From Swiss-Prot:
GO molecular function: GTP binding; GTP cyclohydrolase II activity; zinc ion binding
GO biological process: riboflavin biosynthetic process
Pathway where it operates: Cofactor biosynthesis; riboflavin biosynthesis; 5-amino-6-(D-ribitylamino)uracil from GTP: step 1/4
E.C. no: 3.5.4.25
Family annotation (SUPFAM superfamilies): RibA-like (SSF142695)
Name of the featured protein: GTP cyclohydrolase-2
Keywords: GTP-binding, Hydrolase, Metal-binding, Nucleotide-binding, Riboflavin biosynthesis, Zinc
InterPro entries found in the cross-reference section: GTP_cyclohydro_II (IPR032677), RibA (IPR000926), RibA-like_sf (IPR036144)
Gene from which the chain derives: ribA
Gene Ontology cellular-component annotations: cytosol
Matching HAMAP family: RibA
């Protein structure tokens, strides 16, 4: 286990009241959060989203990505379902950090795509460690999920880490003229499954 569960509190939101559960990485002290809605106990697979931190999309309403749109849509789907989990994975910018993400944006402004920009900065296309999320699910007592994602790699990594992904639920929202090239690159170079938007 790479994490420990350290704190929890109620979190009222426009979608209803969630239980916010805080986790701490044992090796680094970095924190991550789960939002739990309804009763997630029992054998029925839980609707879940692993959402990687994106300050620009989630809090600053950036149109460069689909992250903020996905966050809102995931919370809506979970609330409509009546039960579910959103893991807020604190690995900003596909885990290159906020300042390097800004540097990557500057390279994208010069014509590089999102993958090329990461490579120019000396990073892989995606530096995230999703095995932490498998530990969060386990600490919440969940071993089977219906995962809201367009990223088959995320499904593969969580499955290898012992989480039973019984269904991949597409979450295709937020495409606009400012992020179309970014989304096309994620599909072409990173294998994301992006069809028509909702």
């Amino acid at each position: 286990m790479q994490l420990k569960r350290v704190a929890e509190a109620k979190l009222p939101t426009p979608w209803g009241d969630f239980l916010m559960v805080g986790f701490e990485e044992l090796a680094t002290g970095h924190d991550h959060v789960a939002l739990v809605f309804g009763d997630i106990s029992g054998q029925t697979p839980v609707l879940a989203r692993v959402h990687s931190e994106c300050l620009t999309g989630d809090a600053l309403f950036s149109l460069r990505c689909d992250c903020g749109f996905q966050l809102e849509a995931a919370l809506t789907h979970i609330a409509e379902e009546g039960r579910g989990i959103l893991l807020y994975h604190r690995q900003e910018g596909r885990n290159i950090g906020l300042l390097n993400k800004i540097r990557a944006y500057a390279l994208q402004d010069q014509g590089y795509d999102t993958v090329e920009a990461n490579h120019q900065l000396g990073f892989a296309a995606d530096e995230r460690d999703f095995t932490l999320c498998a530990d969060m699910f386990k600490l919440l007592g969940v071993d089977a999920v219906r995962l809201l994602t367009n990223n088959p790699k995320k499904v593969e990594i969580l499955t290898e880490a012992g989480i039973n992904i019984v269904e991949r639920v597409p979450l295709i929202v937020g495409r606009n003229p400012k992020n179309a090239h970014y989304l096309d690159t994620k599909a072409a170079k990173m294998g994301h499954l992006l069809g028509k938007t909702e």
